Structures are given as C-alpha cells and as structure tokens.
C-alpha cells in the first residue's frame, strides 16, 4: 500500500504509538450529548467550564502484552497511529484474479489396495441402497394410483347420476319435462282469451284460468307469482271479458254467490282477429313453449 505522505520515515516511526490528541478528555466526552466540535463557541466554553468542575472517573488501564513483534510495545488507543503496510499487508498492487478454477477430483489415498477396495465397496453399497429406496417409492406410487383412480371415478359417477336425476325428471304421461321452458310469445290478454274460448259456455273462474295457463304453458309453473295479478288486472280492466253470476239453481243454500268470467262479443272478435293471427305468425315459438304442441291447432282454432 502506497501512503502518499511527504515525510514517510517520520510517520512510519510513529507506528503503534499515540503521538497526539492526548489532551482530549474522553472521560467527560462520554457524558455529553454531542461532541464539542459540533457545538457553538459559547456552548464549548460552558462545556469546558463544566469539565473543569467535574472530575472524570478514574478508568483502570492495564498494559497488555504486545503480540506484534515488528513494532514497538504500545497500548491500543482510539488515536493510535498505525502503518497500513504492517497492519494489513498486500503482496501485490494488482487485483487478485477472481476466476475460479475447477479443481480436479482428489484421488483416493494410496494407502493400500485393501483400503481402496473397501472404500469402493462402501460407495457401491450406498448407491444400491439409494436405487432400492427410489424403486420402492415408485412401486408405492404405482400401486396406490389405480385405487385412487377408481375412487375418483366412483365419485364422478355418483355426482353425475345425481345431476342427471335432477335435470331429467319424468312427469306423468308420455311427455318429458324440460329443464327450463321458454316464455310463450303471447300477452296476458291472449292467454285469458284462449282459456275462455276453450272453456264450456258457462265460463271459468279465476282459479280455473290459472290452472289452464299452467297446464298448457309450463313456464308459469316456476314463474314469479306476479303473473296472476296481471291476469286479474286484465280481467277487470278490459271490455273483452265480463263477469257473470252463477245461476241460483246451481248454488247450494247458505253459500255466497260466485261469479264466472266469459268472453263478450268484443272478446270473440279479439280472439279471431288478434290471437289467431298471432298464432299463425309465431306458430313455431308458441309450440316450443307448449307442453303439448300437437294441440296448437285445436286450441287456437287454426
């Protein structure tokens, strides 16, 4: 290490010695919140005054043996001057080569043929044990794999059968139920007119109209209950339908009088001119929404 100083011999002669900074009171310096060189001049004067009044505690210092035979005997200190060439010597000024060389494999020590053969047998036995352990793990994996596959297939079959039973339910009669039915392309007035036109001459009550709609158009079996209010609103607000009382002869004594709904003359024209024309135009979509699509000609008088 090349230390760039003017008088090298003088500085090198101070190796391991404490040439200066001996008047720095380190004992009192430890009690200060900051070093004195960081304070202002007034604070430095005050600190020096306090130092004069306060005596630092006596710190026992024992001389230690010097293990460095090259330099003079000295006690290590905070301000000790050292020669870097002695403390951390460097052989060459060039940076060491950092390329790692691959070392050849060390041969077996030639202590004897018997030792070499014993070592060779030990290595072979270890390799055989490793391969046997690896093969046992493979056998365990392959032996448990078919059972695991069978359990998975059984679970899949059970889940698929449950899904199939939920989706494909058989109803009463020759017709199979669908998972979801489309909404018929008809207004509620058309549905009411269709139900009353297919009824006997005496008419139908509100519950019978509900049953007719659910029977031929299964969409309303799972639809929200609001469609019933819409049908009642059409019955009461449109002039195509009228409410007629039931004959007294048909009613038993002691029960309130009931009413039936029928088509008026305007309602019959509405069925012929509007409902039948709509059935001609949307025949296929209506058949898809019907539970018995073969009855479309009979219901709509096509």
Curated annotation (Swiss-Prot):
* SUPFAM superfamilies reported in the protein's UniProt record: Winged helix' DNA-binding domain
Primary location class: nucleus
Return the annotated DNA-binding positions.
183-285
Tell me yes or no: is Nucleus among this UniProt entry's keywords: yes
Q: InterPro entries, alphabetically? A: Fork_head_dom, FOX_transcription_regulators, WH-like_DNA-bd_sf, WH_DNA-bd_sf
Sorted keywords for this record are: DNA-binding, Nucleus, Transcription, Transcription regulation
**Which GO-annotated molecular functions does the record name?**
DNA-binding transcription factor activity; sequence-specific double-stranded DNA binding
Q: Which GO terms describe its cellular component?
A: nucleoplasm
- Name the source's superkingdom: Eukaryota
Give the matching Gene3D superfamilies.
Winged helix-like DNA-binding domain superfamily/Winged helix DNA-binding domain (1.10.10.10)
> Does the UniProt entry include the keyword Transcription?
yes
Pfam families, per database record? Forkhead
Q: What is this protein called?
A: Forkhead box protein R2
Q: Where in the cell is it found?
A: Nucleus
